[in-house]
Amino acid sequence: MAEQGSPRRFARIDRLPPYVFNITAELKMAARRRGEDIIDLSMGNPDGATPPHIVEKLVQVAQREDTHGYSTSKGIPRLRRAISNWYKERYAVDIDPESEAIVTIGSKEGLAHLMLATLDQGDTVLVPNPSYPIHIYGAVIAGAQVRSVPLVPGVDFFAELERAIRGSIPKPKMMILGFPSNPTAQCVELDFFERVIALAKQYDVLVVHDLAYADIVYDGWKAPSIMQVPGAKDIAVEFFTLSKSYNMAGWRIGFMVGNPELVNALARIKSYHDYGTFTPLQVAAIAALEGDQQCVRDIAEQYRQRRNVLVKGLHELGWMVENPKASMYVWAKIPEAYAHLGSLEFAKKLLAEAKVCVSPGVGFGEYGDDHVRFALIENQDRIRQAVRGIRGMFRADGLAPKTAG
């Protein structure tokens, strides 16, 4: 019990570090209150409208009197069948809608609840570093220990993964993967997943794959699903969210497919935690998955054009960032002249002097501290304005373009 006058302590909350992104978010809001025009390329929050046919379906179903009660925590059967059909048509994978699919309130909720359902004190989870924060802290909240696996340039990630499994005592219970990666935009081919599944089966390690950016792909490249690997469902599950593909981030709807035991575990804990997503949202999700997918291609094309503008602009400044072939992010190594600052201080500098808000790489793990992440969430004119702001900062610091990177 806390002493009188002292703050109460909550052990689970104490395990969570300060949220780095809140620091830059608060500085951004303070700057805007002062009237400064800040180009916000920080949070991966789509700025486009949800396709009209999806919105129309939501409105239509929401006007029915019989759709406003509690839904089911596993998702309505019709949506689970649509998920099954989506996998069949897209990846030639059979998913049983009754035992191998579950609807989630966005993938973030599903990931967190899956880890809460399956992990406990003493369990070890392998997570790429850097990685999307819920991949790390979902395990921490569940009480498990996280072992970071470096996902950095010049390092063979699979070899590091294999080394981590063999070197962990006790043996890891689960690995969390996400490709195309947030924040690094790193991609893998199907043969990578084949090796992962073989390794996981050899050591009996559960595999959770986050396929959030399946559709945000460029230049003819296609993102594979781990479910395409024969036997993957024996040991793996995969999450997908409608947030990015259909500009439905605020709708909070996604799904998980794969191993029936893990699907059942998630369904069981969700039956205690929630009543599922609002039924009209689920029916609208059916319209998204089963409707014309040109809208998805159009959204990806918009991101591709923004990527081109940002990468070209930074290259012209001498900041030679990688050109991603997927995701809605540019993962940029901090220019050598600023490397000593680390990602948080460099992000603060960009905000104060270039009027550009980015995500500091350290927020995704310590191995990300030499990078910042640009999210492609402003239009092309605003991205060009961001490049001009960065150019001004470089010039003020005496950096010619050729020495900026």
Language model features with spans:
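Conserved PLP-anchoring active-site segment centered on the Schiff-base-forming lysine
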Residues: 117-139
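Conserved core segment of the aminotransferase class I/II
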Residues: 228-229, 233-304, 308-317, 393-394
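Conserved glycine-rich beta-strand-loop-beta hairpin in the small C-terminal domain of fold type I
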Residues: 286, 301-311, 321-334, 368
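Helix C-cap/helix->beta junction micro-motif
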Residues: 31-34, 142, 202-203, 317, ...
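PLP-dependent enzyme catalytic core of the Aspartate aminotransferase-like
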Residues: 93, 339-342, 349-359, 363-405
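Active-site phosphate-binding strand-loop segment of PLP-dependent enzymes
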Residues: 147, 151-220
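N-terminal small-domain helix-loop-helix segment of the aminotransferase-like
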Residues: 2-106, 113, 288-291, 397-399, ...
